[in-house]
């Protein structure tokens, strides 16, 4: 990394030097059973234990020499002037789907009254309950205030924020600032916008943008994998559509970030397989985890850029051979999540057995609960750093989902 390139990520496996996390906060305590689907959760984590698990995850990374950054801290550091701070508040409010002018005014006054920038950022992440606001006089209530009086939130929380992989993705020296699948998560990208616009280290045009949050088609970081300095992998999934991938790839090639080819993976469109990295991750120079259930239906396209146009070819050969040829290795091994047992594979994929974070070639952070997959990985010579995640996993994401590399050593 140099002063000109604060982002440097040219692989999935190079030694991890710097990573972005988000410690789960009060947004988790604003989950409630009636609105889990709306907020893209299946269960409610216990915040105190989730924070302990997340702190242990961060410490495990530090113990391996990784510098840990926090989203909430970088976002707070990006509010460098009162004018930028006020602009952030107004943009946040404009995207929060607030019902009623009087309600919006009361929330703005609440946020403007918070003096500490990090406290402000954490409050915007947590959401605002109606009970926190002064009672609006009946004469000032609009129709929406009256019709939706039973809904408890004036602004929804952002409980998915601890999955920092998705709102934006680091690619080479650039960043894809994503337009996300759901309204619930699309609001999360405001923090990346302010970091990469105003932060003293990461703002000011130092990081080229290869996708913009104002695009109308969806893409998420769990579908963006950097396999090598030459090759990217992208997923066409529940959360990322093909049109977004085409826009992303044109920008990457035009920005000349060094990549020569992209492998686009098309697979089942459902929550169980919401992102490519929930079913496929790179763990060593020549090894990948894969969920066996996707192998039969998987389609792969090779994409290159020639004469200012994308050239797309559907690949028909063996996946392992295709990966080996593109990575310049003799052989690639696909390690099946859960092994050959369909019950174990289904259970451990649901608990993110395939969602590993590689912090150096052959050194992988995993949830300890996926015992069958972990034993297979160890039998292949991989070093595992096992973390507890009984609460964290309730959000349906693993170590890769919970981390966004900012700097890796080249391989």
UniProtKB/Swiss-Prot annotation:
GO terms for molecular function: arginine deiminase activity. The active site is at residue 401. It catalyses: L-arginine + H2O = L-citrulline + NH4(+). The keyword Cytoplasm applies. GO terms for biological process: arginine catabolic process to ornithine; arginine deiminase pathway. It is an enzyme of class 3 (hydrolase). Coiled coil: none annotated. GO terms for cellular component: cytoplasm. The keyword Hydrolase applies. Pathway: Amino-acid degradation; L-arginine degradation via ADI pathway; carbamoyl phosphate from L-arginine: step 1/2. Belongs to the arginine deiminase family. This is Arginine deiminase. It comes from Streptococcus equi subsp. zooepidemicus (strain H70). The lineage of its organism: Bacteria, Bacillati, Bacillota, Bacilli, Lactobacillales.
């Amino acid at each position: 990394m140099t002063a000109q390139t604060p982002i440097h990520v040219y692989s999935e496996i190079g030694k991890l030097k710097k990573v972005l996390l988000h410690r789960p906060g009060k947004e988790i305590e604003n989950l409630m059973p009636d609105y889990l689907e709306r907020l893209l959760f299946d269960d409610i984590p216990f915040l105190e234990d989730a924070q302990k698990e997340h702190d242990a995850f961060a410490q495990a990374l530090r113990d391996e020499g990784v510098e840990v950054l926090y989203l909430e801290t970088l976002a707070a550091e990006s509010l460098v002037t009162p004018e930028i701070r006020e602009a952030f508040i107004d943009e946040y409010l404009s995207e929060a789907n607030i019902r009623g002018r009087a309600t919006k005014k009361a929330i703005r006054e609440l946020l403007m009254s918070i003096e500490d920038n990090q406290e402000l950022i954490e409050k915007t992440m947590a959401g605002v309950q109606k009970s926190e606001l002064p009672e609006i006089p009946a004469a000032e209530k609009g129709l929406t205030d009256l019709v939706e009086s039973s809904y408890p939130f004036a602004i929804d929380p952002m409980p998915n924020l601890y999955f920092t992989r998705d709102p934006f993705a680091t690619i080479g020296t650039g960043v894809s600032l994503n337009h996300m699948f759901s309204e619930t998560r699309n609001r999360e990208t405001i923090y990346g916008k302010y970091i990469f616009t105003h932060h003293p280290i990461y703002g000011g045009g130092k990081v080229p943008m290869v996708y913009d949050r104002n695009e109308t088609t969806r893409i998420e970081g769990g579908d963006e994998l950097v396999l090598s300095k030459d090759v990217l992998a992208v997923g066409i999934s529940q959360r990322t559509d093909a049109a977004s991938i085409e826009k992303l790839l044109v920008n990457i090639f035009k920005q000349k970030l060094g990549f020569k080819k992209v492998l686009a993976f098309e697979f089942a469109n459902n929550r169980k397989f919401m992102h490519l990295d929930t079913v496929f991750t790179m763990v060593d120079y020549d090894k990948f985890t894969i969920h066996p259930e996707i192998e039969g239906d998987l389609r792969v396209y090779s994409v290159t850029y020639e004469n200012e146009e994308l050239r797309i070819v559907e690949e028909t050969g063996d996946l392992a051979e295709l990966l080996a040829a593109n990575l310049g290795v003799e052989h690639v091994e696909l390690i099946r999540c859960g092994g050959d047992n369909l019950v174990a594979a289904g259970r451990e994929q649901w608990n993110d057995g395939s969602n590993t974070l590689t912090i150096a070639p052959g050194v992988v952070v995993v949830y300890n609960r996926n015992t069958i997959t972990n034993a297979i990985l160890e039998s292949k010579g991989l070093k595992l750093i096992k973390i507890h995640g009984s609460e964290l996993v309730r959000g349906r994401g693993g170590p890769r989902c919970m981390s966004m590399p900012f700097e890796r050593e080249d391989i």
